[in-house]
Every structure is written in C-alpha cells, then in structure tokens.
C-alpha cells in the first residue's frame, strides 16, 4: 500500500493510525488494557 491509499483506522492491521490508541495485531490483543 502506498501513502496515497486511504483506509479507515482499523485496530488489528498492525498499523497505528490516527485515532487509534493501540494496534497490536488483532482485535483480541487490542482489548488488552
């Protein structure tokens, strides 16, 4: 994916996007506080 690709912030894609507090790889892992 290039910088011109726009995607919504998703917790689980291993990328920390704007608006995300964590991105640990999977939605389950991201629920760990």
UniProtKB/Swiss-Prot annotation:
Activity-pH dependence: Optimum pH is 4.0.
EC number: 3.4.24.-
Main location: secreted
Temperature dependence: Optimum temperature is 30-40 degrees Celsius.
Regulation: The fibrinogenolytic and coagulant activities of the moojenin were abolished by preincubation with EDTA, 1,10-phenanthroline and beta-mercaptoethanol.
Binding site for Ca(2+): 10, 13, 15, 17, 20, 23
GO molecular function: metal ion binding; metallopeptidase activity; toxin activity
GO biological process: proteolysis
Cellular component aspect of the GO annotation: extracellular region
Cofactors named for this entry: Zn(2+)
InterPro entries per the UniProt record, alphabetical: Disintegrin_dom_sf
Domain of life, source organism: Eukaryota
Cofactor: binding details: Binds 1 zinc ion per subunit.
Described purpose of this protein according to its UniProt entry: Metalloproteinase moojenin: snake venom metalloproteinase that cleaves both alpha- and beta-chains of fibrinogen, but not the gamma-chain. Shows a coagulant activity on bovine plasma about 3.1 fold lower than crude venom. Renders the blood incoagulable when intraperitoneally administered into mice. Induces necrosis in liver and muscle, but does not cause histological alterations in mouse lungs, kidney or heart.
Similarity comment: family membership: Belongs to the venom metalloproteinase (M12B) family. P-III subfamily. P-IIIb sub-subfamily.
Protein name (database record): Zinc metalloproteinase-disintegrin-like moojenin
Organism: Bothrops moojeni (Lance-headed viper)
